């Protein structure tokens, strides 16, 4: 579809722009419409911006022929009388205009450009209406920058043409001046008088063209200045985004687009600088009084140089902030003696063909004058050279991939240390880069700085160091403020909340929802706190112990973050972990669901722990909430949480195991939620010689060990109980092994004993209370907690056939006095002694319980 035809279909606001355009133009709109196809088929850009006037003259005569031809056609149709009149009128008017061919070419070229701009605006507005979500906030500004660059290029081409015409005009003047000067005629000679008159007219025309070129140069410089004022804020927006991206925020800015714009701006400025040099040379050849070009060129050149310096200094940036390879999710934290990477970039992609550019790195060029501020040296090479070949193919990028820091020794001996008012993790350091840039005779020393980094000496400091990086980049308005932690500001919750969510979205792929953020807010400020005006101090963020676990808030949250990343990432991303929910909210949610509904939440009393809570409705309408002892990473390294949930067993009164976890909150069947995580690939080539085994978690109901302080009363219809858990492996359950202490101690059972691993900790039902009073007599629990014990009580000693005769009627009543004063491990440090009938064979060291025996498949006889 022709451009004019598309313009006729626009909405009224854009039609008004089109009418306004042609109301200010010499070309009538009916002439544009009648000759639309012919006009759009011609190369008006070459005719208007080219150095050869013959192309403009040729198009001019073709245009007149086309008008004359169409006037003849219209004369045959009486209904086209008005159109015929307008065509003839424009035919006469255009021939009367001075420099008609050039004026016509420039006019139509500019009209076509404006038409295209209106058409693009209309198309963009239509897309915004159809897909408003796809429109970026800065989309309009981006299109404005693109259109301005196109306009500036057109102005530059026009200025080049004007300067070329000025050269021709000056050559004509010089030639005529030499002819006049060499002529030896009388002053009253009419021919001499005519020569002087022509020479004066030539000088007047030269002066006119000089003024036009000077005005065009000023206009171009003004437009270039405006473009810089648009580009620099876009670069600052990118830097702010980069600073927030370092602490987990999403990064939207495209650096390649900025590089394209900055390079285009620099090319235009360097080109204008070269043109001004040419104009300076022209003005020095022909000098006369009141010549504005001679003085004006120097002023314009100084302004162009100032703009170039400003652009180049701002265009030298740190593209990738310092980061150690082992902690890519936590940049700006460096460890002494460990390698780190950093990348710098010059967004003005212009380099001399034979000039290599060398960047040099340093640290703390202007350190703060504070006592105890540590000083560091860069051990590896602090220089990086960029060859023209690499610069042309990859851009002006300096990659420092193997930098290492070492602390300077204080006092000439011994290891340096920090004795200042700030701790190591609050001390901020800045790495700087310098490059000597040369292009087209302009030499500049460019400098850029990284964001402040924290330098640690031990990886144990990583968590608190990251808290410092988070706090600084969230709140600091000055990215070079190394004394920020001398008086750190408070963090408003409306900034801190999203930043905490970024930690999860960037590290584990899913941020925090409003409910989870609400729980964290209540944990920090209390449940009755208003959402407006809440702010948290730096000390409270990293040091204040928050109930109920009395753990510092950041330490507690960071341990959870590590736990999710290492063991629970898929569950977290799929939304199966509610995570941040208080115990009171947990009770409120589960109370309204059916029995067997469970949820997963993070422990508030244990670092990096996750627990499972479920609800059971009793026959007497009482509601019980059970919670498993929290699982830590030590347990989850051996047994994934998905398998724990799918294979968990709770022993009933009859010692029958059953899985009470049936529905993930609100009502998702357990196997539907977790089945996809437990699919194991079968090895068909493996000979089935052994009975398969698996680890499971087992809990017992032992109400006789339940203790509840009498002064702490639970809700009348809701009891909350906490279960200690044990890990029970198949193929044969046996004596109890406490798995977590074994894992913490690093016990290696070996492949021979792995099938026999069993942990049947006698779990205890405990009320979920913040404090447990010691030495309180056992209360009357009431009918709602009178669960049947596992074993029937006995009133008389009953002979046990499996004991030796001398131990069957042993009186244990008198031994009760030793119950709280002796420890069995002090008496028998090597474990239970073997009885006479027992064997020392390892394979027979465990006596298994049949009720805990589980297997995955049929029993297949062994060949051995």
UniProtKB/Swiss-Prot annotation:
Highest taxon of source: Eukaryota
GO CC field: cytoplasm; cytosol; ISGF3 complex; nucleus; plasma membrane
Compartment list: Cytoplasm; Nucleus
Keyword Phosphoprotein: yes
Modified residues (Phosphotyrosine): 690
Domain SH2: 572-667
In-chain residues carrying the UniProt-annotated modification Phosphothreonine: 812
Modifications after synthesis and translation: Tyrosine phosphorylated in response to IFN-alpha.
Presence of the UniProt keyword DNA-binding in the record: yes
InterPro entries membership: p53-like_TF_DNA-bd_sf (IPR008967), SH2 (IPR000980), SH2_dom_sf (IPR036860), STAT (IPR001217), STAT2_C (IPR022756), STAT2_SH2 (IPR035854), STAT_linker (IPR048988), STAT_N_sf (IPR036535)
Main subcellular localisation: cytoplasm
Disulphide-bridged cysteine pairs: none
Gene Ontology MF terms: DNA-binding transcription factor activity, RNA polymerase II-specific; identical protein binding; RNA polymerase II cis-regulatory region sequence-specific DNA binding; ubiquitin-like protein ligase binding
Single Gene Ontology BP annotation: regulation of mitochondrial fission
Matches recorded under PROSITE patterns: SH2
Keyword entries, A-Z: Activator, Cytoplasm, DNA-binding, Host-virus interaction, Nucleus, Phosphoprotein, SH2 domain, Transcription, Transcription regulation
Phosphoserine modified-residue sites: 283
Subunit details: Heterodimer with STAT1 upon IFN-alpha/beta induced phosphorylation. The heterodimer STAT1:STAT2 forms the interferon-stimulated gene factor 3 complex (ISGF3) with IRF9; interacts with IRF9 in the cytoplasm. Interacts with CRSP2 and CRSP6. Can form a homodimer upon IFN-alpha induced phosphorylation. Interacts with IFNAR1; the interaction requires the phosphorylation of IFNAR1 at 'Tyr-467'. Interacts with IFNAR2. Interacts with ARL2BP. (Microbial infection) Interacts with African swine fever virus (ASFV) MGF360-9L; this interaction mediates degradation of STAT1 through apoptosis.
Protein's job: Signal transducer and activator of transcription that mediates signaling by type I IFNs (IFN-alpha and IFN-beta). Following type I IFN binding to cell surface receptors, Jak kinases (TYK2 and JAK1) are activated, leading to tyrosine phosphorylation of STAT1 and STAT2. The phosphorylated STATs dimerize, associate with IRF9/ISGF3G to form a complex termed ISGF3 transcription factor, that enters the nucleus. ISGF3 binds to the IFN stimulated response element (ISRE) to activate the transcription of interferon stimulated genes, which drive the cell in an antiviral state.
Family: Belongs to the transcription factor STAT family.
Protein name: Signal transducer and activator of transcription 2
């Amino acid at each position: 579809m022709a451009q004019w035809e598309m313009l006729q279909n626009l909405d009224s606001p854009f039609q008004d722009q089109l009418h306004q355009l042609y109301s200010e133009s010499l070309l009538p709109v009916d002439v544009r419409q009648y000759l639309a196809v012919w006009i759009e088929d011609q190369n008006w850009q070459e005719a208007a911006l080219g150095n050869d006037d013959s192309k403009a003259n040729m198009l001019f005569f073709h245009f007149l022929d086309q008008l004359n031809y169409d006037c003849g056609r219209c004369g045959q149709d009486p209904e086209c009388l008005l159109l015929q009149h307008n065509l003839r009128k424009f035919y006469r008017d255009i021939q009367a205009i001075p420099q008609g061919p050039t004026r016509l070419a420039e006019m139509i070229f500019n009209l076509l450009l404006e038409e295209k701009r209106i058409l693009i605006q209309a198309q963009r507005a239509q897309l915004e209406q159809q897909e408003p979500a796809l429109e970026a906030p800065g989309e309009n500004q981006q299109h404005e920058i693109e259109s301005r660059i196109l306009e500036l290029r057109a102005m530059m081409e026009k200025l080049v043409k004007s300067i070329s015409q000025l050269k021709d005009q000056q050559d004509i003047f010089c030639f005529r001046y030499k002819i006049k000067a060499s002529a030896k005629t009388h002053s009253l000679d009419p021919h001499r008088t005519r020569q002087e008159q022509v020479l004066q007219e030539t000088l007047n025309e030269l002066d006119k063209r000089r003024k036009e070129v000077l005005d065009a140069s000023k206009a171009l410089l003004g437009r270039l200045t405006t473009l810089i004022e648009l580009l620099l804020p876009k670069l600052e927006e990118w830097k702010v985004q980069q600073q927030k991206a370092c602490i987990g925020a999403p990064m939207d800015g495209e650096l390649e687009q900025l590089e394209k714009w900055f390079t285009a701006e620099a090319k235009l400025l360097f080109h204008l600088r070269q043109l001004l040099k040419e104009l300076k040379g022209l003005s020095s050849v022909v000098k006369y009084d009141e010549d504005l070009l001679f003085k004006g060129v120097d002023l314009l050149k100084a302004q162009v140089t100032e703009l170039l310096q400003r652009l180049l200094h701002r265009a030298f940036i740190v593209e990738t902030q310092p980061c150690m390879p082992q902690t890519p999710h936590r940049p700006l934290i460096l460890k002494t003696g460990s390698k780190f990477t950093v990348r710098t970039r010059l967004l003005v992609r212009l380099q001399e063909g034979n000039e290599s550019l060398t960047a040099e790195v340093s640290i703390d060029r202007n350190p703060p004058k504070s006592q105890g501020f540590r000083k560091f040296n860069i051990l590896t090479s602090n220089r990086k050279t960029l060859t023209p070949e690499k610069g042309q193919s990859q851009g002006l990028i300096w990659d420092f991939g193997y930098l290492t820091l070492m602390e300077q020794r204080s006092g000439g001996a011994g290891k340096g240390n920090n004795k200042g008012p700030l701790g190591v993790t609050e001390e901020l350091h800045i790495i700087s880069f310098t490059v000597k840039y040369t292009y087209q005779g302009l030499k500049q020393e460019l400098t850029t700085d990284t964001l402040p980094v924290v330098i640690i000496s031990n990886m144990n400091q990583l968590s608190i160091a990251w808290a410092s990086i988070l706090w600084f980049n969230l709140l600091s308005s000055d990215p070079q403020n190394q004394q920020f932690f001398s008086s750190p500001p408070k963090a408003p919750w409306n900034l801190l909340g999203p930043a905490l969510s970024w930690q999860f979205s960037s590290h584990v792929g899913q941020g925090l929802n409003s409910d989870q953020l609400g729980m964290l807010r209540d944990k920090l400020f209390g449940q009755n706190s208003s959402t407006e005006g809440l702010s948290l101090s730096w000390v409270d963020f990293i040091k204040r112990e928050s109930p109920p676990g009395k753990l510092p808030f950041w330490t507690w949250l960071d341990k959870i973050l590590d736990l999710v990343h290492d063991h629970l990432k898929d569950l977290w991303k799929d939304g199966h972990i509610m995570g941040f929910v208080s115990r009171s909210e947990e009770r409120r949610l589960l109370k309204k669901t059916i029995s067997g509904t469970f949820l997963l939440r993070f422990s508030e009393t244990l670092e990096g722990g996750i627990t499972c809570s479920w609800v059971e409705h009793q026959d007497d309408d009482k509601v019980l909430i059970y919670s498993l002892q929290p699982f830590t990473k030590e347990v989850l390294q051996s047994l994934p949480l998905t398998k724990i949930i799918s294979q968990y067993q709770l022993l009933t009164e009859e010692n029958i195991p059953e899985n009470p976890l049936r529905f993930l909150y609100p009502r998702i069947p357990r196997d539907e939620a977790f089945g996809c995580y437990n699919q194991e690939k079968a090895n068909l080539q493996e000979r089935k010689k052994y009975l398969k085994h698996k680890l499971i978690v087992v809990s017992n109901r032992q109400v006789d060990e339940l203790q509840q302080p009498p002064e702490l009363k639970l809700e009348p219809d809701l009891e909350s109980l906490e279960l200690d858990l044990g890990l029970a492996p198949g193929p044969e359950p046996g004596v109890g092994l406490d798995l977590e202490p074994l894992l913490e101690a690093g016990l290696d059972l070996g492949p021979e004993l792995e099938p026999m691993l069993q942990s049947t900790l006698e779990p205890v039902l405990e009320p979920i209370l913040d404090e447990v009073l010691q030495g309180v007599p056992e209360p009357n629990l009431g009918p709602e907690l009178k669960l049947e014990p596992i074993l029937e009580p006995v009133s008389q000693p009953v002979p046990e056939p499996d004991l030796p005769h001398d131990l069957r009627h042993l009186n244990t009543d008198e031994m009760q006095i030793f119950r709280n004063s002796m420890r069995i491990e002090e008496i028998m440090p090597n474990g239970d002694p073997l009885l006479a009938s027992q064997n020392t064979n390892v394979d027979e060291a465990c006596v298994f319980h049949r009720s805990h025996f589980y297997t995955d498949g049929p029993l297949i006889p062994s060949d051995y």
